[in-house]
Amino acid sequence: MNEFPVVLVINCGSSSIKFSVLNASDCEVLMSGIADGINSENAFLSVNGGEPAPLAHHSYEGALKAIAFELEKRNLNDNVALIGHRIAHGGSIFTESAIITDEVIDNIRRVSPLAPLHNYANLSGIESAQQLFPGVTQVAVFDTSFHQTMAPEAYLYGLPWKYYEELGVRRYGFHGTSHRYVSQRAHSLLNLAEDDSGLVVAHLGNGASICAVRNGQSVDTSMGMTPLEGLMMGTRSGDVDFGAMSWVASQTNQSLGDLERVVNKESGLLGISGLSSDLRVLEKAWHEGHERAQLAIKTFVHRIARHIAGHAASLHRLDGIIFTGGIGENSSLIRRLVMEHLAVLGVEIDTEMNNRSNSFGERIVSSENARVICAVIPTNEEKMIALDAIHLGKVNAPAEFA
């Protein structure tokens, strides 16, 4: 093992690679960055928030070579002891993170039709990393695996059985790495025993989902076979009546592909407001009296509150509601509106704590009189991926997650 081992965390998206390098001893981030515009002439690399530098080679392999060169410039290349990959979809095959072997790669490829935009990019990242870092243990961490503890009644759709049996049509859930990290931190913050606890975690960002966590395990979540189901999001519709879309198709002669683009790219906050998918823009418009921005936010909040309350029904007891993700951590307005909707559950807001900036870190934002504790816990998916790699790679883990 290296004297100063580090973990390289790689998240290959459909056109980007986000990466970070963490000290294996305490998971402190040593460097991070993004390569974006992959497979286009505009491909660039930005390290530690610096100026974007054009990439000479636009492929995933070319981008990872450029990332490896940045590590080399900082004398970190030879210290890479482990590599953790975020994998979008593990299907029902992967119930936990796994050391990457030929068999694991084959199984990732088998389930890749469930998430073609992301899984094939993930595989490109794995193959390139194997060439650049030969002999380094690599670990796959799946966005879906945390939710594989859901019971059949939570993951089945009310469709003919053959679609589940023959095609694997069922609810898988996403954001699992975030929900797992945040629920683990919540046990510490709220002083709960992991084997006797009930939490609802709201991961709110441009993509958003709710997860019910009972005794440390996911028992229900709002996203489904794809990330489209559940909450209204930045550009995704969330739950929508299939009959409504069928009627739209008949009236507009749009194809299934057209409608898929509409519900994924043109709906949600953007669709209702007609203004933006960025909540920061909509909050500014909210305060300026923009009616459709206000309506978009109210609809967003209504869906969040309804799903939080519904997911609580999957718990034996509701100990806490946790906000995380870019919006959940940073928008005091959204948290306030959601908590006001949840007064029926005994939620009461502590206005002063709710209004504190996210730099304050983990914090309880409900009042002392509340029957249900509400808290903000910043997510850290990179750290969770690194911790899984450390655990599977047999490196000493930081005490908080050992």
UniProtKB/Swiss-Prot annotation:
It is an enzyme of class 2 (transferase). It catalyses: propanoate + ATP = propanoyl phosphate + ADP. Its cofactor is Mg(2+). The record marks 175, 236 as: Transition state stabilizer. Keywords: ATP-binding, Kinase, Magnesium, Metal-binding, Nucleotide-binding, Transferase. PANTHER family: ACETATE KINASE (PTHR21060), PROPIONATE KINASE (PTHR21060:SF17). This is Propionate kinase. It comes from Escherichia coli O6:H1 (strain CFT073 / ATCC 700928 / UPEC).
